[in-house]
Amino acid sequence: MTTKNNKQLKSVLFMFLLLIGAYVKAQEKNVSGTVTSSEDGMMLPGVNIIVKGTASGTTSDFDGNYNIEVPDSNAILQFNYLGFVTQEIKVGAQTNISVVLQVDQNELEEIVVIGYGTVKKSDVSGSVSSVKSAELTAYPTVSAEQALQGRAAGVQVQSNNGGEPGAPIKVRIRGGTSINASSDALIVVDGFVGASMPAPQDIASMEVLKDASATAIYGSRGANGVIMVTTKKGTSSKPTLELNTSYSLQHVNNTIDLLDADEFATYRQAYSENYVQGPANTDWQDEIYTTGSISNTQLAFSGGSDNSKYYISGNYFAQDGVVINSNLERFTILSNVDVDITKRFKVGLNVFGGRSTKDGVSTQAQTGGTGGGDVISSAYRFAPDLGIYNADGTYTINSLGDDIDNPYALATESVDERKADTYRANFYAAYEFIDGLEFKTTFGFSSENTQIGKFKPTTILAGAGVGGEATFEYRNTTNTLSENYLTYNKSFGAHNLSLLGGYSYQKVQNEGAFAGARSFVTNEVSYRNLEGGAVTMQPSSYLNETELVSVFGRVNYEYASKYIFTFTARRDGSSNFSKNNKYAFFPSGAIAWNMAKENFLKDSNTITTWKWRASYGATGNPSISPYETLAKFSSVYAVVGDQQVNGVVLTDFANDNLKWETSKQLDLGLDVALFDNRLELSFDYYTIKTEDLLFPRPLPEYSGVSSQIQNIGELENKGYEFSINSRNITNQDFTWSTAFNFSRNKNKMVKLPDGDDLFIDSAPGHFLQRQTQILREGEAIGSFYGYEYKGVYQGGNFPEGTATLSGDSDPGGELFADLDGNGEISTADRKIIGDPTPDFTMGFNNDLRYKNFDMNLFFQASVGGEILNYTLLELGSGAANSTADMVNAWSPTNTNTDVPRPAVREKRITSRYVYDGSYVRLKNLSFGYNLPESFLGKTGLQTVRLYVSGQNLLTFTDYPGADPEANYRNDNNQRSNTNIGLDYGSYPNVRTFTMGLNMKF
């Protein structure tokens, strides 16, 4: 990767030098100056300065300075900035023109993107949080989803596997609204529903739509909230080139303190006297962890004229992970072109393309038996008194207790390669028939092709038993979207009316194929020569389609900036459902009252906005598989005599009554702005009740089918959110702004099939598969379920209400609560032992600027919420290495301890391994410096910013695991909703140090 990165850097520098030469030209007349605000005297960065009547222009730098060439003294400079009155000045004989822009009270307000349109922030009647480009790029992140963490109240962002390069990231808004369907937020990029996120540097703004009033316009897909992403566009100015590049070093945030070789030998000999200590003393975590790195470079070219605008951006991202042999390389390109054909006719095209290549390592995988484990869990458990190699050069294998693969061999010998190509194009045309009445049509298409190749050689346990195993998988998803809608906006005195009506058609097609082989004569073939395997694995393939047709509408009415009414409705029809429930209707309504505009407050010097909001509506979740309503059959065969007879067997009954899960949400909110918007506060209280949850209902054995998916459950989310944004200090040399958000969400099951408890297994196919969690009416989703640990048994009679498990009744064993009082511990003694849902989450951001220096300080916190640490449970089982606290284990001479005696124990779910997952983390600390205009001189550069930053620098927590943000990877919807708060063998989280450069010319 180093050579490749060097080549990339050289290429970028070469382009940079060429472009500097291209833009240096003869000057007819040069004008410079400073642009400031009339309100507070602050310098205004990013002001558009255009030579009127031409495409020539520039923008003011971070300190409000600008420099522009004009053809002659008759030229007129036009100064344009959002929220301020446009000003025009004739150049004449002047060479220095400093401008004070006046605040435009009519345009000052922030514009918020909502479904199929935009509104002024003051006219929003629903619950919407906005995240701007500067916040998303305040520090380097691997994805835009990660940059969203802690930035908006009510939004939970979590990696599917710690700091793994390319790990999927889940975004949840106001908790999970489903059990067996998806609870992930819907992502809409430039109007394309279901698009993948662009790079953070290409995003202009991001709006999080949270309540039903805001999300009902997306109907059956809006139950989990909507994230509206708007990418950057060109401006009517001279061409501008931006280069943003950074290089990061990454280190493992935290390791687990384990027994060394001598301690391990003493530990094993305590219950296995014949154990002979090995010859080595290996720190296996040190063997698989390394210093990671990230190289991230973006080059963006933008500009335009009065009639056309363009923005073209390319991004190169390369990451070497902190686990050896794990990396990711990604290229993306984004293009936005907007053209005004006439005053009333506009067209535009958005194109996105990307390729990613990922080399992964096995994590959170099956352990024990022939599975052998994964890289992370094996590093924790592998005997420390063994080295990497045997005397004959082969890899060592842990064969005492659980069979465990050599973690170094797993990381370096196994192959897990993924290549994904993503393309998206979205075209629009808009025609304004009369003032305020516009028709817009869009057509978009996206395709994502993924290839996954894996090889398990004979040098690891999973491959040794089958002579090596190679698999290859192909997946393709295409998404076609066509939308047509009319908008009408009209003002009648103090009355403002906005109407929207439209039609949408979307088709998603998924196809894929799988092939594999075993028993290879050599490990050199990998997965690209499947015919080299003597044994062919069962191949498979699939093809499915989903079509969604919709009509939608919205009415916004606002009177005198005081009273706001919104009604939204959408009717969806999906091919996934049968004729009985093919269509569903999702309405919502909202009202808002800006009390600050009333006569008794409008002259207040303190209160700028005091807006009460209320909304109620219904949204849906259509996440059932295509053909789920149909009867299903599987092929079978039998041998009759000497002939094979083929046939089919019924595996699922048809269900014509399946329908959407529906979430009904009430939201009550208050938005306050004080002191000319210097202090902004927002509060929301909400309840979300999801009905018709999809659950498998058990069927009688005589039916021949084990269960059937039916709509028979209900759950509820309740919570509140609070956010503050303040400009604490604003003067010419120093500014300080603060943003704080606070969220609390609690959920519970309201209704289950027949009222019965449902036990949730974790880690399917894993030797750790256990009933870890429970769904019970009135209790939190995913509550941990197991035995209540009561300490170490000291001998004699059991303390009242306690007992030991069978086979562990000697002194030093584990004591548990005997709930049924029969003197024995059985499954009847299990209870709810923890709730994985945090009590509340917080984000606290500070931006400071002094002259040319800037600093960002960002904290993120989660308080409450337990974690079941599978890793520590496994390490405490006695079947492999253990944690360092085992040196303080119970013994006849060390009875004053809470660590049980060394022994091989069954891996049971107990409260001993349930921990408080609270933490406060310094998510980012960055320092930047903008080179002054006087230094840049005649270079052609507008701005140059140098910065250094650190992420995850400090973490305050009592959690004993590797990281409190750990999350067990779940690849299906059910377990991603219920197997929350599990920590097992996750790819480690990282601490990152970055140096970066931003240039604009």
Swiss-Prot record:
- Main localization is membrane
Q: Does the keyword rRNA-binding apply?
A: no
Positions of the TBDR beta-barrel domain:
238-1001
Q: Name one GO cellular component term.
A: cell outer membrane
> Sorted alphabetically, which keywords does the UniProt record give?
Cell outer membrane, Membrane, Receptor, Signal, TonB box, Transmembrane, Transmembrane beta strand, Transport
Location(s), subcellular: Cell outer membrane
Residue ranges annotated as motif TonB C-terminal box:
984-1001
PROSITE patterns the record matches: TONB_DEPENDENT_REC_3
| Induction note | By ulvan and rhamnose.
Annotated Pfam families: CarbopepD_reg_2, Plug, TonB_dep_Rec_b-barrel
InterPro entries for the chain:
CarboxyPept-like_regulatory (IPR008969), Plug_dom (IPR012910), Plug_dom_sf (IPR037066), TonB-dep_OMP_SusC/RagA (IPR023996), TonB-dep_OMP_SusC/RagA_CS (IPR023997), TonB-dep_rcpt-like (IPR039426), TonB-dep_rcpt_b-brl (IPR000531), TonB_rcpt_b-brl_sf (IPR036942)
Motif TonB box: where in chain: 109-116
Q: Which domain of life is it from?
A: Bacteria
Location of the TBDR plug domain:
120-232
Signal peptide (residue range): 1-26
Membrane topology category: Multi-pass membrane protein
The job of this chain, per UniProt, is described as:
TonB-dependent receptor probably involved in ulvan degradation. Ulvan is the main polysaccharide component of the Ulvales (green seaweed) cell wall. It is composed of disaccharide building blocks comprising 3-sulfated rhamnose (Rha3S) linked to D-glucuronic acid (GlcA), L-iduronic acid (IduA), or D-xylose (Xyl). The TonB-dependent receptor may mediate transport of ulvan oligosaccharides from the surface of the outer membrane to the periplasm for subsequent degradation.
| Similarity-based family | Belongs to the TonB-dependent receptor family.
Q: What name appears for this protein in its UniProt entry?
A: TonB-dependent receptor P3
Which organism is the protein's source?
A: Formosa agariphila (strain DSM 15362 / KCTC 12365 / LMG 23005 / KMM 3901 / M-2Alg 35-1)
